[in-house]
């Protein structure tokens, strides 16, 4: 809701100052893109602890459930 009020206020202020309609539309597109990128950055920062937790859980599960290779099937011996 606050974003909508910002866009409407931005539009009105550009009209009052005498900017052309094409300039207003261009400014609204640029402002929308900047607000979108800012929102995505804020969301990424907000979710970062959960993403790190998910990575840690996967790492622990892979460490616990590592495939056990029998000694006779290892491929680290010399080949002739």
UniProtKB/Swiss-Prot annotation:
A Pfam match: Phageshock_PspG
Native source species: Escherichia coli (strain K12)
GO cellular component: plasma membrane
Biological processes annotated in GO: phage shock
Job description of the protein: Effector of the phage shock response.
Name of the featured protein: Phage shock protein G
Location of the protein in the cell: Cell inner membrane
Domain of life: Bacteria
């Amino acid at each position: 809701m606050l974003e909508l009020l910002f866009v409407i206020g931005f539009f009105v202020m550009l009209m009052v100052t005498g900017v052309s309609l094409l300039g207003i539309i261009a400014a609204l597109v640029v402002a929308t893109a900047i607000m979108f990128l800012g929102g995505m950055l804020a969301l990424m920062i907000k979710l970062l602890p959960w993403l790190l937790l998910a990575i840690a859980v996967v790492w622990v599960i892979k460490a616990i459930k590592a495939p056990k290779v029998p000694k006779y099937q290892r491929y680290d011996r010399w080949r002739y």
